[in-house]
Amino acid sequence: MVTVRAVTAHEIPDRAPIRVTPGQQVQLGERDTTWPEFVFVTADAGSGWVPARHIEPGTGASGVVRTAYDTTELPTAAGDELTVLENDEISGWSRVRSASGREGWVPNSTIEPVPPA
């Protein structure tokens, strides 16, 4: 596993995270202007940003989830050391675990590799 350090803080959004599962129907909203790989989806359990490749577009503004995705983000402070669980280079985000065991997504622009000791 790769260890990274937060070079800037990452604050999480005010809305609760959502989890979508394969076969689930969702309503598609706008594309994110900062993160164009993401589309805003509304599901039974709430709304959030999901990489568009996880959604099969349907008719109109609906879609079906292709692969499971959890939108949980991890708040970080500059200097935090994190373990990378998944690096999604396409979207520009990595799923990481903190020293306390919490997991979530952070923008790749906020982290850098820690050189081996």
What is the predicted function of each stretch?
Residues 1-117:
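Src homology 3 (SH3)-mediated interaction modules
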